[in-house]
C-alpha cells in the first residue's frame, strides 16, 4: 500500500479544523459529540484524510463510551498501532496505515470474538452507506 504524504498546509486546506486537530495533531473529540458515535446504518468507515477503508458497520458496537467503537478493523493492514505515553498513561494509538492519520486508540475490553475495542474519533472517519 503506497503512503500518502502531504504538508501540514495541504492537510489543513483539505480538512475541517476539527478533522485537522484530531487526525494530524493526535486530538480527541469530546465524548458523545461525534457524528458517528450512535450511527447504526450499514456501511463502511473510511479515513477522512485519504479514503482508506478502515472499519465496517458489521463490527461496530455500542461501548457506552461516546465514541464509535469497533471490535476489528475491516483489514488489519489498513491500520497501524503504536504505543502512546501521553496524558500520564500508556495506551495503544491507532493510525491509518496509508496517511498516518490519528484515528483513536484500541483497548482490551471489547466484546467477542476479538476482545478488542477500537475507540475511534468520528472526526477521523467518513461514513459511506451500503448501497
UniProtKB/Swiss-Prot annotation:
Keyword flag Oxidoreductase: yes
Catalytic activity, as annotated: L-methionyl-[protein] + [thioredoxin]-disulfide + H2O = L-methionyl-(R)-S-oxide-[protein] + [thioredoxin]-dithiol
Free-text remark on how the cofactor is bound: Binds 1 zinc ion per subunit. The zinc ion is important for the structural integrity of the protein.
Cofactor: Zn(2+)
Binding site for Zn(2+): 47, 50, 96, 99
GO biological process: protein repair; response to oxidative stress
A single GO molecular function term of this UniProt record: peptide-methionine (R)-S-oxide reductase activity
Name by which UniProt lists this protein: Peptide methionine sulfoxide reductase MsrB
Species per Swiss-Prot/TrEMBL record: Acaryochloris marina (strain MBIC 11017)
Amino acid at each position: 500500500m503506497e503512503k500518502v504524504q502531504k504538508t501540514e498546509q495541504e492537510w489543513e486546506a483539505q480538512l475541517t479544523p476539527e478533522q485537522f486537530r484530531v487526525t494530524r495533531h493526535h486530538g480527541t473529540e469530546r465524548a458523545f459529540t461525534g457524528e458517528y458515535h450512535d450511527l447504526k446504518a450499514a456501511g463502511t468507515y473510511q479515513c477522512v484524510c485519504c479514503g482508506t477503508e478502515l472499519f465496517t458497520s458489521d463490527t461496530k458496537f455500542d461501548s457506552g463510551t461516546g465514541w464509535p467503537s469497533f471490535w476489528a478493523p475491516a483489514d488489519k493492514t489498513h491500520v497501524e498501532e503504536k504505543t502512546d505515553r501521553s496524558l500520564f498513561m500508556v495506551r495503544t494509538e491507532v493510525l491509518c496505515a496509508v496517511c498516518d492519520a490519528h484515528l483513536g486508540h484500541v483497548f482490551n475490553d471489547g466484546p467477542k470474538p476479538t476482545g478488542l475495542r477500537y475507540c475511534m474519533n468520528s472526526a477521523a472517519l467518513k461514513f459511506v452507506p451500503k448501497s
